[in-house]
Amino acid sequence: MSEGLFFIIETFIKAVVILAVIACLAGLATYAERKVLAYMQRRIGPDMVGPVGVLQIVADMIKLFTKEDIVPANANRFIFLIAPLISAIAAFAALAPIPFLPEFELFGHTIRPILADINVGVLYVMGVASVCVFSPLMAGLASYNKFALIAAARAVMGLISFEVVSGLALLSVIMITGSLSLIDINNYQKGIFGWFVFKQPLAFVLFLMASFVECNRTPFCLTENETEIVAGYGTEYSGMRWAMFFIGEYANMIASSIVITLIFLGGFNSFWFVPGGLMMIFKASCVFFFFLWTRAAWPHLRPDQLMALCWKILLPLALVNVLITGIALI
């Protein structure tokens, strides 16, 4: 088999496998979240469908697939229908330059678990993540619903504001490594004390907080509040279109967990006798669990509180961190 044909087949298989695995993990994440919240709140959680309730995911899928797809009479039909797709597509597209595991040999060929090894991987992920802002905006505007419109405005406000913070947080890491490639940043962190969580702790905290906003997670979730704006920009959605928002949200959480692991927690570098692949899965799982834990442990912030936190505290801290990093590198 020629190298060109093998590359095409390999890329196609990797794309299918990555999409299938992340889609399955996004479904499993809903079950994991319900179980984690249940144990933290002294409840049992899903336990009726299958062993320990694990088949609840299948039951939810059947329910969502069989629900009627309703479009409000006054809604802009075309925009209303495509808005949920943008959320899921952008979340999956962000996975392209992410190396999930170390490379390995198979049938005499070196397999790299990454779709596109581009030298501007960080910039690509940031750019695609910013596209996610169009999904709630379009859903809110097209729904012809005041709750959805308010939620869309909140989502745009939060996402645009924290994109600045996350960009500045990553800038300090890029200044040290001199590369925008996620693989180069991962390879730079040799040894546990080489992790950027120790070299750039402030950048880590800032990027983590920005990830909460981009993933629409508590305590920085502005788009859903049953006492204020009901289900936010998803109020008028039903069936699988409603589910697409959550598939995108959980896929975003998984992607964010992997990116945080790669950039700040040593990525897939081996640790003592533990292989790099297992370390990658373990660290990303811990970050993902933190996303779930905060929902049960922290209250929501008001929009004005979140904006004050972003522009008055986090942004100045990010600028100071970049300045100090630059001075240290001179």
From Swiss-Prot:
NDH-1 shuttles electrons from NADH, via FMN and iron-sulfur (Fe-S) centers, to quinones in the respiratory chain. The immediate electron acceptor for the enzyme in this species is believed to be ubiquinone. Couples the redox reaction to proton translocation (for every two electrons transferred, four hydrogen ions are translocated across the cytoplasmic membrane), and thus conserves the redox energy in a proton gradient. This subunit may bind ubiquinone. The keyword Transmembrane helix applies. It comes from Campylobacter curvus (strain 525.92). PANTHER family: NADH DEHYDROGENASE SUBUNIT 1 (PTHR11432), NADH-UBIQUINONE OXIDOREDUCTASE CHAIN 1 (PTHR11432:SF3). It catalyses: a quinone + NADH + 5 H(+)(in) = a quinol + NAD(+) + 4 H(+)(out). Pfam families: NADHdh (PF00146). The lineage of its organism: Bacteria, Pseudomonadati, Campylobacterota, Epsilonproteobacteria, Campylobacterales. This is NADH-quinone oxidoreductase subunit H. The gene is nuoH. It is found in: Cell inner membrane. GO terms for molecular function: NADH dehydrogenase activity; oxidoreductase activity, acting on NAD(P)H, quinone or similar compound as acceptor; quinone binding. Belongs to the complex I subunit 1 family.
